[in-house]
Amino acid sequence: MVKVDLESKRYGEKLKEVFLMLDNNVVECIKEITESSRNGKLVFFVGAGVSTLSDYPQWWRLVDKYHEELYGSPKKGNYSSDEYLRIPQIFYNVKGEMAFDGILKDFFQVDKPTNPIHDKILAMNPAHVITTNYDNLIDTACWKRGKYFSVISAEEDVANATSSRYLLKVHGDFRKGFKGENVVLKEDDYLNYDQNYPLISNLMKTIIATHTIVFIGYGLGDYNINMLLNWVRKLQKDSFHKPFFIRTDPSPIENETLIYYENKGLRIIDAASLIDSNEYDYLERYSAVMDLLIESQENKFITKDDEVIDYIYGKISPLFALQYIRKIDLKHVFEYDYHFEVNGTVVRHKNKGFGYMERFFELKESCDERSKLSKKQYERFNALFNFFEKNGVICMAKDAGTLNTSIEINSLAYHGKYDVMKKFIEEQSVSIEDDYKKAFFLACLGRWEESYDLYSNIILNSIDESNGCVYYLSQINRYRIYQSITQAVTQFNGLGLLTFGRHYKPFTDEFLARIEREMTNFNIDDLFNGMPFEFQKKYKILEFLSDNQFLYDDTVKLFELTNKVRSEMSEGSYSFGMSSDIVVLLRLYDNLRFLYENCLWSVSFHEFHQYIRNSMSLLIEKAEYERTRDIDELGFSFFGKKSGFFMEYYDFVNISRHFKIDDIKNLERSCSIDKIRFGEQEKIEEYLVGIAEEITKQFSANGMNVVFYTQFISEAKAALYFAKYVKLSEEGLGKIVKALLFYFPERDLDIGKRYVWLERLTKCNELPKSIISIIDDFLVLQAEKHIDQNYSEVSSNGLYSRDYGALIKHFEKNFISKRLSEITLCLTQDKQKQIDFLFKLLPLLSTNAKSHLLSFKSVENINDLMNGIRIGLIDEFTPEHEELIIEYLETRKVNYIVEKEKGIQTFSSNDYMSTFGIWYFLEEINNSKMEEFIGMDDQYDFFVDPENFDYKKFIPSWLKNYNDKLLGKIAGNKHMKHHVIEVLKERVKNSNDKRYLEILMNYFI
């Protein structure tokens, strides 16, 4: 090796020159040590030589003292390794414990300062420090630098450790007094070490087996070093990770000696081979090595383009096995030298050395500079270029202009391509990666038992193939499938009878018993730390998956961004640069793409759905704010127009997949979704049609997969509900309406809810004739069902087939149903169920059919009256009609008294009291007896006697159901107006429901 005069140049430049002239083996040693430091796997094993730099008493002098007390004089010549242990043992046996302890106290009761090497050791950020020294110098250095380690020098300290970092004093110390029982010194102490210190011994062995060890402060002939080296080799066995040894002898090591120790598994960094120094200047030699390590840790020795490419490639190439990575996780790969922003820009952070990422992007922009790279480096550069491009890493932030960040997820599962997934599963696997993808697709298709078993096989096969990445991800996915299965079993046991009409068991008892046995005591939190060291080093960014709260950091960040966005909204401020809502959007899609493209199972977990819901809700809330706020001069000057937010395909899918119907309703109450532009409508339609076709397939055939059904049906309901805002082709709309009316399970959407979904679809699409024909087919089917005298339509919202007829008439006033008319013309008096049903659809019938039907039907009860009004058969109330209403109210009053006595105070969905109250208020009914029925229904009372009504009982949501005529009449009523205005003001202030503001502004102000 070439020596450099350290006195000739500035120290930093000298170190760089030393580094550039180092032997390649030493360079690799330095790189590996600094890499271990960055990965939290570095352990320094500190010997007496480091304490000697602080003038702490040396061990051989203590042995000399014992020898002199025994034999009257110091030993002539050097002690052998055995004598270092035997002489203290002889003294203890001959002179006794008290004399032995007395010499210890006299010898070691000193106060010495720490030295620079203690600080330099800690500057390398070791995970643990192990030492055979008795002193407290390293303890003191830790406290000075704010590094907290649990000091363990006795057995009881192990259980009382308060930090995950240990300062392990394997030979004890004198914190509990200068007694031989507190330290390892004499021969018996060494021979009985494992027996006397089992906890410390096991802890040390565990650390040694899983970390990179650097010995410092020892001599190659030291008894401790030979014993410890044998331990390391024994513990690490086949995966023996050769420890490092910092040698600080004055003269360079002989080549034969170097080879000898390398064959024993010790990698030596020889200070004397690096620098010329005074024979007695051990501090300078220690410092030379430690400073090289520290400077290398800060990338100060990277200068050439080849080194830049090699360094980045070494960090990134293990990640080529992943289909996508989250940009924010790259900071872990580069030890926080840079931050990788979600918009694809890179920001220098902790890097104090050469700007290697800056240089990479300079090479990216310069063909001339790239052409100077060697063939190997050019290939590596292209591999890195492709990796960064695929993962959306674009440029340094300082060089970024206007960025158009595109969003693209290439997962079949994300896009709901179920048929393509099934086809892939049936094909022959070429690699273990194919099997891994198949297991994920099986899970997405609800075939969880098959998925679990395939993951189990992959785990075994990946061990044989040494494919750590597939092994780790399969372990995580298998565990999460297991969680999904246990949740499903609980759900089916508790709700299966209500949902499916019977207790449904999608998994056999044998399978459940087996997976319970296999997963008992499996702790996902321990998975990453249990992986081989090399895997942990390469895939640090995957550690967060080995955690039940793997979205925790993003959830916290989302909370911060939510507060920031809402603060901006409340203050009316403008964001410059990348706004908080854009950060939310990009982080959201980074997470989605990472999870889906790497086939990570997470879609059945509440936390994941909640994270998506919160993110999307925030984006829409911000868009509503941007749409409705006034643009001031600043806005015109800098922006010129309001927010350009629009709903893309991916946004639509995320809302469909992760929002419940109530969540969408909440959005609609707080934001004008209809004012948001919906882009990529063809892609959205393809997605919606795919859902419709899947519903049709699932419920056209026997043997429906109930597990798939439970995870798919919520998405289907939300997607078709949210489709209100999408302009569809007539063909696509037809497929959706058919699936909705003929194939959607009654238990999920009864006839009333299906009407709501259908009516919403007309907002952007109206009701083309082809769709009217589909609805007509549906009504014919319903008419045929009513042949059964026991059949009744089930509705949870008071909407029935009659409302479908009204919807048709709204869009096609002259529509006549030929088939319904034919059924009607075939009616006979005994088919009363069909007569009642078709009476409600009277407007859709031909003139002859109407006449024929009315020959069987007259207005005989309140339901006939209400149906007659709905279908337009009754335009004005006759005295006979009012008598029917009064009879109904009298019956209702009697029932009310009985129900009240029984503790029942609710009305059925078919109760007409509030409707009759409204008609009385609008003077469509003038019967004075109406006031006799006050006290049964608050809404009825509000309209019949507004002057004396108790407005504490007024429910604001009533107003949202009233039409323009009724709201106008309320606003003109002197008894109602003031009270209603106060209620509306309170709702505007304390709720996000924009409808209250619209009612207040449009009718009352």
UniProtKB/Swiss-Prot annotation:
The active site is at Y134, D135, H171. Residues 296-548 are annotated as: MID. The keyword Cytoplasm does not apply. Residues 56-111 are annotated as: Inter-dimer interaction. Changing Y134A: Decreases the NADase activity in presence of the phage tail tube protein. Coiled coil: none annotated. The record marks Y574, F576, I918, W919, L922, Y962, L966 as: Interaction with phage SPR tail tube monomeric protein. The keyword Hydrolase applies. Residues 549-1005 are annotated as: CTD. Changing N133A: Drastic loss of NADase activity. GO terms for molecular function: hydrolase activity. One of its GO terms (biological process) is defense response to virus. Residues 1-295 are annotated as: SIR2. Pfam families: SIR2_2. Keywords: Antiviral defense, Host-virus interaction, Hydrolase. Changing Y260E: Loss of tetramerization. No effect on NADase activity. The N-terminus SIR2 domain serves as an NADase effector responsible for NAD+ hydrolysis and is necessary for tetramerization. The C-termius domain (CTD) functions as a sensor for detecting invading phages. The middle domain (MID) connects the SIR2 effector and the CTD sensor. Anti-phage defense protein that is activated through the binding to the phage tail tube protein monomer and which hydrolyzes NAD+ upon activation (NADase activity). The resulting depletion of NAD(+) leads to an abortive infection. Homotetramer (dimer of dimers). Homodimer. The SIR2 domains are arranged in a central core, adopting a head-to-head arrangement, while the CTDs are positioned at the periphery of the complex. Tetramerization is necessary for the activation of NADase activity. The NADase enzymatic activity of this homotetrameric form is autoinhibited. The activated form of DSR2 (after binding to the phage tube protein) exists as tetramers and dimers, with the tetramers exhibiting more NADase activity. Each tetramer binds 4 NAD(+) molecules. (Microbial infection) Interacts (via C-terminus) with phage SPR tail tube monomer protein (via N-terminus) in a 4:4 DSR2-Tube assembly; this interaction induces a conformation change of the tube protein and activates the NADase activity of DSR2. This is Defense-associated sirtuin 2.
